[in-house]
């Protein structure tokens, strides 16, 4: 064989190898471009976080939203459930639809919520503790209303001889709220008021003595006739009459001091064995019996007489015009 021909053939093979090596970078670039295009196509099918969550029936769109769908039983169709902001919301929607369609055979993405077990345990704990709390509450309850006061002997220890309570007695406290309104009394009524205070203190002292001796079984030492009896209707009429007439002695401090001194002197001078003589309350006050309204009083209005009444009303007809008489 000719050595020149063999050498020429060897050079030709080397040239072919060089051309192949020069063509290899192009093939590598084509493979790289094909792989990158395939990756782009894969990314377009789902969102970037689609591989992180593996929930049944849940997938992510390329723009980031999550969608949920469920396959209906015994069918190949899927039921659309909606678009959600997070994967957990889409998974919950799938679980609700699965329970509705499959019942107890549903395969859920999320386990049953633990708050239900927590609530059941808390309810059991509360049920266990409720008897103790109810017993403690019944033990701590107290009556809202006060207990009634014990009844006293005779049933009249809280009231005076004329139904006036001792704890609010205007005669003993020296108050003038009932006898004297905002305008007060005239001096004459002030004197009458002093006499009424004296009489009320005397009656109260007699009643207390009577009640104390009744409790000690010594009622024989006191005569019931020592307590002067006045008409309650006349008493209230006197009070109302004093309020209507009015005066300027309600706020007089000196008159109040006189009342207090008079009350002390009368209270110290009175005793059980030597009661003072009976005094007519109406005459001692200087009041006209015509002003009193009671069982034995027949006159109410203080007129001078029937002649004055008839004369005053009879004079009305003297002023009637005789011309008007024709129309009657």
Curated annotation (Swiss-Prot):
Region ranges (Disordered): 1-56, 111-141
Localisation per UniProt entry: Nucleus
Entries under InterPro entries matching the protein: AP2/ERF_dom, AP2/ERF_dom_sf, DNA-bd_dom_sf
Keyword entries, A-Z: Abscisic acid signaling pathway, DNA-binding, Ethylene signaling pathway, Nucleus, Plant defense, Repressor, Stress response, Transcription, Transcription regulation
Gene Ontology terms: biological process: abscisic acid-activated signaling pathway; defense response; ethylene-activated signaling pathway; lateral root development; mitochondria-nucleus signaling pathway; positive regulation of DNA-templated transcription; regulation of L-ascorbic acid biosynthetic process; regulation of protein localization
Renumbered ranges of motif Nuclear localization signal: 41-48
Positions with biased composition (Polar residues): 16-26
Pfam families according to UniProt: AP2 (PF00847)
Free-text tissue specificity from the UniProt record: In seeds, mostly in embryo, and seedlings, especially in vascular tissues. Confined to the hypocotyl, cotyledons, the root cap, and the root quiescent center.
SMART domains, alphabetized: AP2
DNA-binding region: 54-111
Induction: Only in young seedlings by ABA, imbibition, glucose, 2-deoxy-glucose (2DG), trehalose, and osmotic stress.
Main location: nucleus
Gene Ontology MF terms: DNA binding; DNA-binding transcription factor activity; sequence-specific DNA binding; transcription cis-regulatory region binding
Bias kind Low complexity: ranges: 27-37, 113-138
Cited function: Transcription regulator that probably binds to the GCC-box pathogenesis-related promoter element. Also binds to the S-box (5'-CACTTCCA-3') photosynthesis-associated nuclear genes-related (PhANGs-related) promoter element, and thus acts as a transcription inhibitor. Involved in the regulation of gene expression by stress factors and by components of stress signal transduction pathways. May have a function in the deetiolation process.
Family per similarity comment: Belongs to the AP2/ERF transcription factor family. ERF subfamily.
Protein name: Ethylene-responsive transcription factor ABI4
Species this chain originates from: Arabidopsis thaliana (Mouse-ear cress)
Phylogenetic placement of the source organism: Eukaryota, Viridiplantae, Streptophyta, Embryophyta, Tracheophyta
